[in-house]
């Protein structure tokens, strides 16, 4: 029954209750009045609940903006130095001190470290260094975030030892670039190796000078003059 009809019934019962004089009739009308009032109350609660549900359904769903980290940039520029206890690597990243602490992560092994900076100005930054020159202490190594800088502290496993290079690869590359002098080889061969190295690394003027000296040397040798 509609709420309007129940309200009319209630008004009529109230009128009858005012006119009734016999107890039995009044008790019956009072019971009916309570019943109708309960029905009206339930109807109103149901109506309010439906209205609230409609309002909830009409609300636009909350849109959660995804956190995009964009692409990952590999870090290739850095500086390093050392103390008796630590090898220190300095990486410059503008604004890195403003990202949450958990966004700057470093994983250490005995001969490597892996830096990952997440969601810095919409990008992630990664730096992986393998084959460190010497072993480090994983437990003793750490990181520090300063203004626009990440400082990686690699604790030397053997203190008071000097690192001439950061990695074994760098050491091998540098050693290959050095002229080789073998005491057991002919001294003139060692000199030729040095000249060859200078020639390969020199500019056009240097190459012309060496070529001229080489030609003159060959001409002297052809004449029996061994001076160079």
Swiss-Prot record:
Give residue numbers for the modification (N-acetylalanine).
2
Q: Which residues carry this modification: Phosphoserine?
A: 3, 34
Q: Name one GO molecular function term.
A: S100 protein binding
Give the start-end ranges of region Interaction with SIAH1: 2-80
Q: How is it modified after translation?
A: Phosphorylated on serine residues. Phosphorylated upon induction by RA or at high calcium concentrations.
Q: Where is this region: Interaction with SKP1?
A: 73-228
Name listed for the protein in its UniProt record = Calcyclin-binding protein
Q: Which organism is it from?
A: Pongo abelii (Sumatran orangutan)
Q: What gene makes this protein?
A: CACYBP
